[in-house]
A protein has these predicted regions:
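Short, acidic, small-residue-rich periplasmic hinge/interaction motif at the N-terminus
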Residues: 36-83, 135, 297
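Periplasmic-side early beta-strands and strand-to-turn transitions of outer-membrane beta-barrels
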Residues: 171, 183, 190-192, 211-288, ...
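Gram-negative outer-membrane beta-barrel transporters
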Residues: 384-391, 484-487, 508-589
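Outer-membrane beta-barrel signature, preferentially recognizing the C-terminal barrel domain
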Residues: 280-298, 323, 416, 429-480, ...
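Conserved C-terminal beta-signal and adjacent last beta-strands/turns
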Residues: 213, 425, 557-650
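Short acidic/polar hinge/loop motifs at secondary-structure boundaries
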Residues: 130, 137-166
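Extracytoplasmic beta-strand/coil segments of soluble accessory domains associated
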Residues: 58-75, 91-138
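Structural signature of Gram-negative outer-membrane beta-barrels, strongest in the C-terminal barrel
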Residues: 267, 308, 341, 368-487, ...
Length: 650
């Protein structure tokens, strides 16, 4: 009854807020229609494919360059892509990138991977070979090299673009960028001036958000935002509620100051949430961050210094494990034009993770608290061998407390073909650094220890080879294709003791192998109102145990990945200032634990009522009332979601 009263109170508060907001929106709609004709949708929807190909990206070289000439397999999810989609959070928006595989396992939990290695819960292997950043702030957790998906929330209307690189990015971004880099870039505050309100309600998602931006003086602007949401529970394989619904409130700000040569950005966020558990208890999450970035733009060089603090606290039910991580990061970099044909970027930084873990009788870390200090220095040189041919070579040296100094080199050759196509080839090296979960964990059943960390655990390593092309053969067609081969060594395995007894088990590095495959996607502007965007990734994994491996749990312990996944996105601008966008996705069968292939569909119908008002009806997972994306007992039954939304700018 207490739980019921609490939930009813939550729904009453949100229903009142949503009703008030919808009343304001309907009033604004009536007055706007009385004043005149509705305005067109966002300008980006009117861009040609050629203009989209020249969107500036920064994640490939840590400096601004046109997407068409970037020598990497990079896909850009634009602001307009997100606004027109049915996505209600960042993981759902990432499904728009055909070079990513996003799997939902619970109401607040997602697995995000690129080019394989999405993890295998049977062996406690997590998706840990992908680096995710928000405005240059790493959101990966040092405890197990993965992410907490419940910390990825930003106001989707404030996202400028998401740059998704499939392939190694360690030379510029550091360890754990083994299979890819995701850089979520939010809009400058001068682009978000005025007031904005967003209200949404559906069978699974209820959300209310607001933002206000203004000018401080001639050179400075700011914005402040806040939102609160509730996401309903999924179902278990037995058809009962999974009790995994969750709620979260988040607020933040951003200020931007700029002159002809200098710019300064200061931004921060704070959040608090509650997550229900299968045993009907509650977990909590708290956190926040503060970031400052200064840039100086000179005639022949650019300089940047960035510092941030991040706090992430995850609490299980009363008496359960709690994870607290405080991150302190400082980074400097400089880009120098060393002559007409040479550009050098160099820099370095230091990061400190201060973590504390509340041990339980079944899960312990020894020691339970620790400070991890990581240092790095890098340099990369882009040399123009000819007017259309560039050679890029870089190397980063990174020092972490578990493995010491490690070199992370990268070499690329790119060829710009008449401005309409780019070809590139690359060879790179990256690692996944050891973590407390590898070195310091102790797992027990009663007094019996069945798993212990291994202080001799080594970094997982990959040497990656890639060749690709990006082209626009006609004004209405663009495409990108990349073929890759990744050679892995020292992959994590589960081992057992031989000399004395079978237990405790421990983590080893006795697996190696390779993956190879293709990423491909494109755009076809059928006419001035309809665009189709197909994409596919095919991956083949060939792994083997090294001599001396126990071979417990088999090769499948490394990953449980489909051999292929594909997307087809349709975007239509319809009469009367309406739009219809749909994204169909296919995910191949999982080998072990097994799961059949499936198709799913997300769609949104939007009406740009006026320059200030947008109404929409959207749905996710529309093909099935419920479906499984990860086999039980590790994945819940993901439920179909339908939602109505109203956005109001004033």
């Amino acid at each position: 009854m207490a739980r019921l009263r609490q939930e009813c109170g939550f729904w009453s508060r949100h229903a009142a807020r949503a009703l008030m907001t919808c009343s304001l929106l309907l009033g604004a709609l009536h007055s706007t229609l009385a004043r005149g004709e509705a305005a067109p949708a966002d300008d980006l929807a009117r861009m040609s494919l050629g203009e989209l190909a020249n969107i500036e990206v920064t994640s490939v070289s840590k400096s601004s360059e046109g997407l068409q000439r970037a020598p990497a397999a990079i896909y850009v999810i634009t602001h307009d892509d997100i606004q027109r989609s049915a996505a209600t959070n960042i993981p759902e928006a990432l499904r728009l990138a055909p070079n990513l595989l996003v799997t939902q396992t619970a109401s607040s939990a997602y697995v995000i991977s690129a080019r394989g290695f999405g993890g295998n819960p049977n062996a406690q292997n997590f998706a840990n070979k992908l680096l995710i950043l928000i405005d240059g702030r790493s959101v990966y957790t040092p405890l197990f090299s993965g992410i907490y998906a419940n910390t990825l929330d930003v106001m989707l209307q404030d996202v400028e673009r998401i740059e998704v690189i499939s392939g190694v990015g360690a030379t510029l971004w550091g360890a754990n960028a083994m299979n890819g880099v995701i850089n979520i870039i939010t809009r400058a505050s001068y682009l978000t001036q005025g007031s904005f309100v967003d209200a949404a309600a559906g069978n699974q998602v209820q959300e209310l958000g607001a933002r206000y931006g203004d000018r401080i003086n001639g050179d400075a602007t700011f914005r402040a935002y806040g939102f609160e949401f509730h996401r309903g529970a999924m179902e278990t394989a037995g058809g009962t509620t999974a009790h995994d619904g969750w709620s979260k409130g988040q607020g933040g700000f951003r200020t931007d100051w700029s002159t002809d040569r200098d710019s300064l950005t200061v931004q921060g966020d704070f959040y608090r949430g509650t997550e229900n558990m299968l045993d009907n208890s509650d977990g909590m999450l708290f956190g926040g961050n503060l970031l400052a970035r200064y840039q100086n733009h000179g005639a022949r060089s650019d300089f940047q210094v960035q510092a941030y603090f991040d706090q992430n606290e995850q609490f299980g039910p009363a008496g359960g494990t709690a994870f607290v991580v405080h991150t302190y990061d400082l980074e400097v970099q400089q880009t120098i034009a060393a002559g007409a044909s040479n550009r050098i970027i160099w820099g370095g930084g230091e990061r400190v993770y201060a973590y504390g873990i509340t041990n339980t009788a079944s899960l312990l870390f020894e020691p339970p608290s620790h400070d991890l200090t990581l240092g790095d220095a890098f340099i990369q040189d882009t040399l123009a061998l000819a007017s259309s041919v560039n050679f890029i070579f870089g190397i980063k040296y990174e020092d972490d407390p578990f493995s010491g100094w490690m070199p992370l080199p990268d070499a690329r050759l790119s060829w710009d073909i008449n401005g309409h196509a780019t070809m590139w080839a690359a060879a790179s090296r990256a690692i996944r650094s050891p973590t407390p979960f590898d070195d310091e964990v102790v797992e027990k059943v009663g007094p019996f220890t069945y798993l212990a960390g291994n202080t001799q655990f080594r970094p997982e390593q990959v040497t990656a080879y890639e060749i690709g092309t990006r082209a626009q053969p006609s004004p209405d067609v663009s495409l990108s294709v990349a073929a890759f081969c990744n050679v892995y060594d020292d992959l994590r395995t589960i081992e057992h003791r031989v000399a004395k007894s079978f237990f405790p088990l421990y983590w080893g590095n006795l697996m190696r192998g390779d993956t190879f495959g293709i990423d491909a996607w494109g755009n076809w502007q059928i006419n001035n109102w309809w665009r189709l965007s197909p994409g596919v990734t095919w991956v083949r994994e060939r792994l083997e145990f090294r001599a001396g491996a126990s071979q417990l749990l088999g090769i499948a312990q490394a990953a449980d990945d489909p051999s292929s996944h594909a997307t087809l996105t349709s975007s239509m601008n319809l009469p009367h200032h309406t739009s219809f966008d749909a994204s169909l996705r296919y995910v191949g069968a999982l080998p072990e634990p097994g799961l059949q292939h499936y198709y799913e569909l997300d769609a949104r119908y939007g009406w740009q009522v006026s320059e200030k008002v947008n109404l929409s009806l959207s749905g996710t997972n529309l093909l099935h009332e419920r479906h499984t994306e990860l086999p039980a007992p590790f994945g819940e039954q993901i439920t179909r979601s339908v939602m109505a939304e109203a956005r109001w700018k004033f």
